[in-house]
Curated annotation (Swiss-Prot):
Gene Ontology cellular-component annotations: extracellular region; synapse
Protein name: Pigment-dispersing hormone
Alanine amide PTM positions: A18
Subcellular location: Secreted
InterPro entries (alphabetical): Pigment_DH
Record key words, sorted: Amidation, Hormone, Neurotransmitter, Secreted
Chief location: secreted
GO MF entries: hormone activity
One family name in Pfam for this protein: Pigment_DH
GO biological process, one term: chemical synaptic transmission
Family affiliation: Belongs to the arthropod PDH family.
Length: 18
């Protein structure tokens, strides 16, 4: 999971992992 990368982009990792 690229939660860290998404956090930097400002996108909630919840939406990405969903």
């Amino acid at each position: 999971n690229s939660g860290m990368i998404n956090s930097i982009l400002g996108i909630p990792r919840v939406m990405t992992e969903a």
